[in-house]
């Protein structure tokens, strides 16, 4: 059986990832492709429990940055073993809201953790598995934060970070995209939803043609 494809959507807070994950899933399903939609951190019951620890906006004690990093990869290891790898093995396509690029951007760029440590954990947990395509939704931090404010809901622990943190996250994402241009497609998310999704559809069409 031909293994499935692994597509990830990345970007900072407020760029429209969740909306466009749904769009990608619907677009692929309409073409007869079995799709598994998932997210990180999370994606399985145990990984979702770790997600709660990571996103809790009012924890009983501060979360150490190294502990945060290890929890991210603990959730990822479980997610890969219980959901992502089995889906790919049976030929399904996995569409994931964030993956390891987010760890390099948030814990590496935002927190300033040593990227060689992140890469070591990546190698241990993923054993060479990488997305086939990463759609990076990019827009100025100030505009993205205004979108988050308009939601009118309680912010999680990451959403409460300041602008400097998110500028570092954005810079890290763009640097990773520049390092892996064949895997990444950078999408200007500071446009209408219709324009953003037209760009996404164009990239998906191009990749499907190259993969067939």
From Swiss-Prot:
ATP binds at residues 11-18. One of its GO terms (cellular component) is cytosol. It catalyses: dTMP + ATP = dTDP + ADP. One of its GO terms (biological process) is dTDP biosynthetic process. Keywords: ATP-binding, Kinase, Nucleotide biosynthesis, Nucleotide-binding, Transferase. Belongs to the thymidylate kinase family. This is Thymidylate kinase. The gene is tmk.
């Amino acid at each position: 059986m031909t293994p499935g494809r692994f597509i990830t959507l990345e970007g900072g807070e407020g760029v429209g990832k969740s909306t466009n994950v749904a769009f990608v899933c619907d677009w692929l399903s309409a073409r007869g492709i079995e799709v598994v939609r998932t997210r990180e951190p999370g994606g399985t019951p145990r990984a979702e429990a770790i997600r709660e620890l990571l996103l809790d906006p009012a924890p009983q004690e501060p979360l150490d940055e190294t502990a945060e990093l290890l929890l991210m990869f603990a959730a990822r290891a479980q997610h890969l073993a219980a959901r992502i790898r089995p889906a790919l093995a049976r030929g399904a396509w996995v569409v994931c809201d964030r993956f390891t690029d987010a760890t390099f951007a948030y814990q590496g760029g935002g927190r300033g953790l040593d990227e060689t440590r992140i890469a070591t954990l990546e190698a241990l947990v993923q054993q060479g598995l990488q997305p086939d395509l990463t759609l990076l939704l990019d827009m100025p931090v100030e505009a993205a934060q205004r979108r988050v404010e308009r939601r009118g809901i309680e912010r999680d622990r990451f959403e409460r970070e300041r602008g400097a943190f998110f500028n570092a996250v954005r810079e890290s994402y763009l640097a990773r995209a520049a390092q892996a241009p064949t895997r990444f497609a950078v999408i200007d998310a500071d446009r209408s939803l219709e324009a953003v999704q037209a760009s996404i559809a164009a990239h998906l069409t191009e990749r499907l043609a190259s993969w067939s």
